[in-house]
């Protein structure tokens, strides 16, 4: 698919294609004994993937099957987008508690992904905070950084210059200027993702403290530069992932794995 780019953005660095990136990513997961548990706030997430297990409700008995082997991925449907903030926090906290309890007992590593809406509707920061707090309580492991990556390229949602866009009627449009931002429950006014996180968190996160993985970092610097940016994160600091091509996501995943190998811990 063609890389996405908003009008007037200027020339982005050329897309960086890493040979056999997918194989390297999968190989790392198997080699390090990692499993991916995706807490999905809406059933549409699991409908866009294949080759993974899906639990229609969080339950400890399902994890042994869904995460049986290193490299396995399991979607866990929390349906928390339909809940109020307190209910969403409770749902993610309970799922994370069971997953980290399973991790401790299995001897493997579970990497939890909080899967939300590519148009930014949902309990974004509250759910991640709940997972990070539960990880610390269950395993004693603190979260160094949180990667915020709402791109869904197949649907025309992408991020350039820290601003998130949705293609509407063929035109890339800042998401705050779309109908999605006028949602009665999850409305927002900011397209810049640093500013969005500040708005969505009620000021608990400031735009200035949010880091960024720019297209220059990703496409010019490659996985090593991505790892350097991620290694600088501490105390659960958020970082915006700029992505307009699947190759951008592959480079970020490879850089994330380099940072993990150096002992850093993240949520996505």
PLM feature segments, named:
Residues 1-2, 53, 58, 82-84, ...:
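Long, low-complexity, Lys/Arg-enriched
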Residues 1-15, 70-73, 79-86, 268:
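Active-site-proximal helix-loop elements at catalytic-domain edges
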Residues 6-70:
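N-terminal basic/disordered segments at the start of proteins
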Residues 26-40, 70-72, 82-112, 116-249:
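Cap/lid and interdomain-hinge subdomains that line or gate substrate/regulatory clefts
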Residues 38-40, 44-45, 254-255, 266-268:
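N-terminal low-complexity or amphipathic/hydrophobic leaders
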Residues 47-52, 65-66, 85-89, 160, ...:
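Short, glycine/acidic-enriched capping/hinge loops at junctions between secondary-structure elements
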Residues 57-67, 220-232, 253-258:
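A short, acidic, amphipathic alpha-helical segment used as a generic capping/interface helix at domain edges
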Residues 245-267:
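Long, internal scaffold/assembly segments composed of regular secondary structure
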């Amino acid at each position: 698919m063609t890389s996405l780019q908003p009008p007037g953005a200027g020339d982005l660095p050329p897309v960086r294609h890493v040979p056999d990136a997918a194989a390297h990513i999968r190989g790392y997961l198997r080699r390090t004994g990692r499993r991916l548990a995706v807490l999905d706030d809406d059933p549409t997430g699991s409908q866009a993937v294949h080759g993974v297990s899906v639990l229609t409700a969080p339950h400890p008995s399902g994890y042994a099957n869904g995460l049986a082997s290193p490299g396995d991925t399991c979607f866990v449907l929390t349906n928390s987008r339909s809940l109020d903030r307190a209910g969403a926090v409770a749902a993610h906290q309970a799922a994370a508690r069971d997953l980290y309890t399973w991790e401790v007992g299995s001897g493997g590593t579970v990497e939890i992904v909080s899967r939300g809406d590519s148009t930014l509707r949902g309990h974004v920061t509250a759910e991640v905070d709940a997972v990070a707090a539960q990880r610390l309580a269950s395993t004693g492991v603190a979260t160094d950084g949180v990667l915020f990556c709402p791109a869904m390229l197949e649907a025309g949602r992408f991020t350039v210059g820290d601003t998130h866009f949705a293609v509407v009627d063929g035109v890339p449009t800042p998401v705050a200027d779309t109908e999605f931002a006028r949602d009665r429950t999850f409305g927002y006014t900011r397209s810049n993702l640093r500013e969005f996180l500040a708005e969505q968190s009620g000021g608990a996160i400031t735009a200035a403290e949010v880091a960024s993985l720019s297209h220059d970092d990703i496409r010019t610097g490659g996985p090593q530069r991505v790892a350097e940016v991620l290694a600088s994160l501490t105390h659960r600091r958020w970082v915006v992932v700029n992505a307009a091509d699947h190759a951008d996501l592959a480079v970020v995943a490879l850089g994330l794995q380099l940072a993990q190998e150096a002992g850093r811990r993240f949520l996505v």
